[in-house]
Amino acid sequence: MTNAPLANPPLQDFIGRHENLFVLTGAGCSTNSGIPDYRDGHGNWKRTQPVNFQAFMSEEHTRQRYWARSLIGWRRFGQARPNDAHHALARLEANGQCGMLLTQNVDRLHQSAGHRQVIDLHGRLDLVRCMGCGRKTPRNEFQDALGRANAEWLTLDAADAPDGDADLEHADFSSFKVPACEACGGILKPDVVFFGENVPRDVVATAHDHLAQADAMLIVGSSLMVYSGFRFVQAAAKRQIPIAAVNLGRTRADDLLTLKVEERCEAALAFLL
């Protein structure tokens, strides 16, 4: 593996030599848009682990805590805008070099930047899904419903946490009211893949189909500590196609990389703009 210096002719050369890149992005791609990431440069958790799927579905107090924090966090998360890293990757697609972008992020900022071929591996936070009937509601609409039911919480503020969460510590969530599905009364959950929940098989299969056509893989802003993303790097390595990564700190795939650039995503990709 080659470690590139801060000025990145090796990365520019890598991208220039390939016509059908499969791009995988993670939280580091969106930190400059004001969305915190989960892990430090060693791949360790910066905070307690995110909410678990089984706990969310089985425990009312877990749902109260999640949605109370989300009520506060969504106000800024929902206003996040693409940064230069998103725009650079959209330019890569416009240049005809990115066949598919697979993102582990749930912020839809790649789409906002104009990227067309995007797979949201872990879903999208701008939708809320009923776990009973499957009905989907725009998150902004559900935000209004949460606010109407919990007006006293609207005056609170807290530091941002990853994926629209807020560090609302030491609060009593027992009085927080979580609306049920208007159609069937079912449990409402953000349309994202929680920890302990499986990525839909059709999403995984579609991503693998596109990876099978790629002539190289580019990882941007991910430590790959979560297997749902790491497995695609394993598949690329099995095909023996070149793999480059832009990430601050270690990744789970360091021994599989052809090239690694330890630099902020927007800086490393600036030559594309």
Spans of model-derived segments:
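Conserved catalytic core of sirtuin-type NAD+-dependent deacylases
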Residues: M1-L273
